[in-house]
Amino acid sequence: MSMTNYPLLERVNDPADLRRLPRAELKTLAHELRAFVLESVSKTGGHLSSNLGTVELTVALHAVFDTPRDRLVWDVGHQTYPHKILTGRRDRMPSLRQLGGLSGFPQRAESEYDTFGTAHSSTSISAALGMALAAKQRGDERRCVAIIGDGAMTAGMAFEALNNAGVADANLLVILNDNDMSISPPVGALNRYLAQLMSGQFYAKARDMGKSVLKNAPPLLELAKRLEQQAKGMVVPATLFEKFGFNYIGPIDGHDLDSLIPTLENIRGLKGPQFLHVVTKKGQGYKLAEADPVAYHGPGKFDPRVGLVKPATPPKQTFTQVFGQWLCDMADKDKRLVGITPAMREGSGMVEFHQRFPDRYYDVGIAEQHAVTFAAGMACEGVKPVVAIYSTFLQRAYDQLIHDVALQNLPVVFALDRAGLVGADGATHAGAYDIAFVRCIPHMSMACPADERECRQLLTTAYEQDHPVAVRYPRGAGVGVAPLPDLEGLPFGKGEVRRTGQRIAILAFGTLLYPALQAAQALDATVVNMRWAKPLDTQLLLQVAAEHDALVTVEEGCIMGGAGSAVAEALAAAGLQRPLLQLGLPDVFIEHGDPAKLLALQGLDAAGMQRSITERFGALPGAQALAAA
């Protein structure tokens, strides 16, 4: 991008450059930075609303703290584009979230300024506390700062960390980036003054001295505490953070550098755990994003002068939409159904369900552990819970899945969105492990629909069971196989032969069925749509194995412990020896990029499957014909 419109930003190649700027120029820098973020994201796609809301806070943090010596830990991390731009990665922004380019989240391997990798929520306070106490152990006076959003504060892990931090006496600053409220201008001026006063050395010393003097006069001390709280209560709600041992400061306007910088400077000189409450607005500075921050949360490419527009040709139906429609249809049919999501209403396709069945919709916040056990409790009382959750986020509730659901054999349906590779969000959001970690749990079953129609059908099958079942499906559009309007399921635990060929049989789990069919056409191979990773259709498997010289399993999940491993176990248990090639995701974390390109790099497109099969089984009888196919 041309830097002609960003003369001040062009001079900032790292935070040291920023700290050399006159304070009077920082507002101009913030203005240019916001415009640069908007231009950049409009060309690449990515997270927008959250990044527009953290511009001034990012500028203030790098202006006040000695980064990277002082540690900044950004919770979730999708709001770190301004941070990346100010820390030497401005010129790489055109590569954002592309194969080989910048990550959309902080990555330690990408920059020394990314002190901790984040993407899942509510981890920042724990990480920053660990850094702060490690520094204290070494006698290092560095500051450690956790920046966490109000949504992430709903997770239990954040409060576990606060509880630990309050008694650890570490030089930790927790900044609550609250973008779910606003401060009116009249309150803002008074609030700015009180925030600076309460964050100052004088206030801290006076408060401690007063407590010392009054320690033998409990009634007076209690009165002083009440007066202190009432003084703060003029402009802030009652807060529990001081109960955790933090010095609470705020709320202050997170877009006002004249308030942010002096407050942070005062806090920098304080010892012990500090809690700063800043109020920001998602989409700040771009009217369209301010008006609809959800729509502009993670847009694709767009013209910022026009905003988001609907495509002229309707896109293919996504698996998420298939789930959302099924949920509404099944709710119409069965009044016992309830839908549960851990703060992913839009992402999981539950908007219509929420609108139509508000009394049966439960958004429990970013609290995956609670969501799973909450569903278990409902199932105990005869309710039929459906938990809509991203595959990667179910990892956070693994103990609850085993202990609270499976151990009690409760009929909970888990709709696992974003199974497999997710493209631009990268390794942190990939659903690579669900087959492996679900199929090893007693009582649990795992369905792997191949297309939109099967997704709806297998959701129905899962719902009809009297034990827990997970249904995994990928992000994005399907293959164009329209779902049937009825609510008929498919046979539980049964697959089907989709193509009959010679010598080699490809056992496909999930949406890789379709590239497998393409590869089989060239190889004249049999293709089996397995549908279920657990229970495995052992009868069909052994029949196919007996009729073929070699077997190939394909899955968009980890090879280790995955569906291919289940096939190998079944063959071994039956005492049947057949050459077996397992194709899937290798034992590495796969980074961000275009999903089709990522699959091709792992050999999971049709050409890659054909190549791997030919290379592996070239020594079998008829290999010449196979190699020439």
Swiss-Prot record:
Keyword annotations: Isoprene biosynthesis, Magnesium, Metal-binding, Thiamine biosynthesis, Thiamine pyrophosphate, Transferase
Residues at which Mg(2+) binds: D150, N179
Gene Ontology cellular-component terms listed: cytosol
Its biological purpose: Catalyzes the acyloin condensation reaction between C atoms 2 and 3 of pyruvate and glyceraldehyde 3-phosphate to yield 1-deoxy-D-xylulose-5-phosphate (DXP).
Subunit text: Homodimer.
HAMAP family, per database record: DXP_synth
UniProt-recorded name of the protein: 1-deoxy-D-xylulose-5-phosphate synthase
Lineage: Bacteria, Pseudomonadati, Pseudomonadota, Betaproteobacteria, Burkholderiales
